Amino acid sequence: MHFKWNYESPTPEQQKAAEELGAKLNMSPVLAHLLIKREITTESAAKRFFRPQLSDLINPFLMKDMDIAVDRLNDAMGRKERILVYGDYDVDGCTAVALVYKFLQQFYSNIDYYIPDRYDEGYGVSKKGIDFAHQTGVKLIIILDCGIKAIQEIEYAKSLGIDFIICDHHVPDDVMPPAVAILNPKRPDDPFPFKHLCGCGVGFKFMQAFAKNNNIPFSRLIPLLDFCAVSIAADIVPVVDENRILAFHGLKLLNTNPSIGLKSIIDICGLNGRELSMSDIVFKIGPRINASGRMENGKLSVDLLVERDYSSALRMARHINEYNKQRKDIDKQMTEEANGIVSRLESMKHNSSIVLYDEGWKKGVIGIVASRLTEIYFRPTIVLTRDGDMATGSARSVTGFDIYSAIKSCRDLLLNFGGHTYAAGLTLKWDKVREFRDRFQHYVEEHISPQQTEPMLNIDAEIDFKDITKHLQADLKRFSPFGPCNQKPIFCTNRVYDYGTSKVVGREQEHIKLELVDSKSSTVLNGIAFGQSAAARYIKSKRSFDIAFTIEENIFKKNQVQLQIEDIRPNEG
């Protein structure tokens, strides 16, 4: 894929601000410019950014209903009521359940957890789950990463004498469920200043408030921060402010003393012995936690995350690793089928969105396929499969387009839907799928801009090879953890040449291993361009080209840097 490069040279005002900030922080203008672009303009803000402090976490009692939630939990414990921690079957839900269950279990034994079966119960609160709670004597359900739209289900639970505390981060409807307390920073009446917590983050704030109210030292929560880091990375929420603090300290824990369950996954992934990043969570750890819920039942992942014995955890980790291998095979097959449909249908090539459906696609994998199609075609995408006389779908969007609002515009055709700006899920009658497709595509056509369907690469700065040093790479690491709203800085260098040894590599000859020289300074650097072998012929033609890249540590030669090439284009100068 060739990107449109979005790069604006710094204004004189920005240059001056970067120079002043760089002088105060003893930092190069390049790094200071990156801070200015992130709207970090003062010395104190920069120190908070580079050294996030747990003491700067927001008071959890600023969240609407937090005092009510803590009081109800205290009452349940005082009365020795049975408590059920209930959560979604994805990474965010599983880590949230593990965090809340592990923390409360230290102080209270009459507690259990429950993850609904994706295939038998579907998303969110299920009647089967409530019946299980009723049969086992549960009086309070703490529900995490779902529940904000479960009006009928929670009314049913209420009729059985079961109370709910909802900890969710998805967009609520105008009418909310009759829960005892609803913790959700996206509530329009919620004054909590940070709106981008994930489900596990909301669960953490609840436990933080409970600890504060009961004079439990905050240090008892710190061993659970690795769950927060995993959920923040996997749920792709903005890594700023509160999330940056939680991710920073959670990642630190993941690298030094992870929980037994996460350690077993790290070992199964072959990641032990190296410094873990948010990317390792997104591409290695997260998919394995997700795999059990995609292929069978997510409870296995929570069993693993709360396990205290390493040998038992390792056995479970091997089990979910097998699920992940199966998921990858199905994912590859479904993506090829979906891609084939788009390629064959001429009309689809001109639409601003993609809606695909097939009776045989696996429900647990359609979200991944939607993500892949969005990356390939850069259009809002919905992939649906059949479940009896119902259709279940997953939606993914492109930067700047609110797919939740697009789905909401068709709500009269839907039985259920939920999510947020860039990802959502929906359920409708199978015989309504075509009408939904037409309405959804019409809405997208009316509301999306051409720029939003154009692959865009945001360049942070132009740089000469001579300025790319090991010291710079080490300084760039201080900007981590990376993620939405704090992406890894992308640089560009114009007029570079092949130094003569660049070659195509990889099992399927899909990558290029590069040795490049900068025309300005004659500095030579190594790089890798994943999936860009189509550019090899041009590179070997001895003509100049421009590259966009991130600056990485060479994992084989620790004292050297390596460029990870994001895009290659002919130089037009």
Residue positions per predicted region:
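Intrinsically disordered, low-complexity regulatory tails of plant transcription factors
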Residues: 150-151, 235
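Short alpha-helices
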Residues: 99, 175-216, 221-233
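Mid-to-C-terminal polyanion-binding domains and interfaces
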Residues: 75-81, 312-316, 322-356, 409-573
